[in-house]
UniProtKB/Swiss-Prot annotation:
Gene from which this protein is expressed: truA
E.C. number(s) listed in UniProt: 5.4.99.12
Organism whose genome encodes this protein: Acinetobacter baumannii (strain AYE)
Class of this enzyme: isomerase
Family, per entry: Belongs to the tRNA pseudouridine synthase TruA family.
Active site: D53 (nucleophile)
GO biological process, one term: tRNA pseudouridine synthesis
InterPro entries: PsdUridine_synth_cat_dom_sf, PsdUridine_synth_TruA, PsdUridine_synth_TruA_a/b_dom, PsdUridine_synth_TruA_C, TruA/RsuA/RluB/E/F_N
Keywords: Isomerase, tRNA processing
Protein name stated in the entry: tRNA pseudouridine synthase A
Coiled coil: none
Job of this protein: Formation of pseudouridine at positions 38, 39 and 40 in the anticodon stem and loop of transfer RNAs.
């Protein structure tokens, strides 16, 4: 039995998220498993580094699978990409020791959330960004983003249906920057709760619209109640961009996305 790690890029528009759903419901995981199973001529199960909601995208989702099939790495990539739908692409594959696990060996994960802030919605970026037409106080949002850095109880900023046993997470960085008409939230943490990034982005958007002051974030944290925070931002602008592992695994490090924005690393 051989273990492979894979890096996957996908648009989440047509899928009900990463994780396999009930029969007849399209998911990214199930779509890739079906193709890899054909190539391997045996059932393949993918184990992803994380889960994404319906409509959320990824530029480097890491996963792994085990197989008895012997193929060169290039053969796996070319074979899979020739059969996968155009909105899913295998970017790299690497043979690994069985010690590697895409989820349990990950030390951190990183997301970017992209807002297009302009009077009119962008037709060519439909469901690839979140459009906000209201004028935003960007400098205020930038200052507010740093409030989420460090170790906190994120009970207020997770979905009511979140199944995680405990809500404490360490956020290494939470930075918001402006790139022309785009606002980009870049956040890295040891782990994320269900809807955590989208709820943080929703909070920042409300601050940018003047609905409350930056210090109100402290009140939200203290409440430890989802009802104390504001909106959940749409999934459209959210991208899973990187997963980090110990150096011993030496996984490929592709450029951070989304690539069409040509953002700084």
């Amino acid at each position: 039995m051989q273990r492979y790690a894979v890096g996957i890029e996908f648009s989440g528009i047509q899928y009900r998220g990463w994780q396999t759903q009930q029969p007849g419901v399209a998911s990214v995981q199930e779509t890739i498993e079906r193709v890899l199973s054909k190539i391997a001529d045996e059932p393949i199960t993918l184990h992803g580094a994380g889960r994404t909601d319906a409509g959320v995208h990824a530029t480097n989702m890491v996963a792994h699978f085990d197989t008895t099939a012997i193929r060169p790495e290039r053969g796996w990539i070319m074979g899979a990409n020739s059969q996968l739908p155009k909105d899913i692409s295998i970017q790299w594959i690497k043979q690994m020791d069985e010690e590697f696990h895409a989820r349990f060996k990950a030390t951190a994960r990183r997301y970017r959330y992209v807002v297009y802030n302009a009077p009119h919605r962008p037709a060519l970026l439909h469901k690839q960004v979140t459009h906000i037409y209201q004028k935003l106080d960007v400098q205020k949002m930038i200052k507010a983003a740093s409030k989420f850095e460090g170790t906190h109880n994120f009970e207020t900023f997770r979905a009511a249906a979140c199944q995680s046993n405990q809500p404490v997470r360490h956020v290494k960085h939470c930075r918001l920057f402006q790139h022309g008409r785009y606002l980009v939230l870049d956040i890295q943490a040891d782990g994320f709760l269900h809807h955590m990034v989208r709820n943080i982005m929703g909070c920042l958007l409300e601050i940018g619209q003047g609905m409350y002051e930056i210090d109100h974030i402290d009140t939200m944290f203290a409440a430890e109640d989802r009802k104390a925070a504001g909106i959940t931002a749409p999934p459209d602008g959210l991208y899973f961009i990187q997963c980090y592992y110990p150096e011993q695994f030496d996984l490929p490090q592709p450029p951070l996305g989304p690539h069409w924005l040509n953002l700084p690393e």
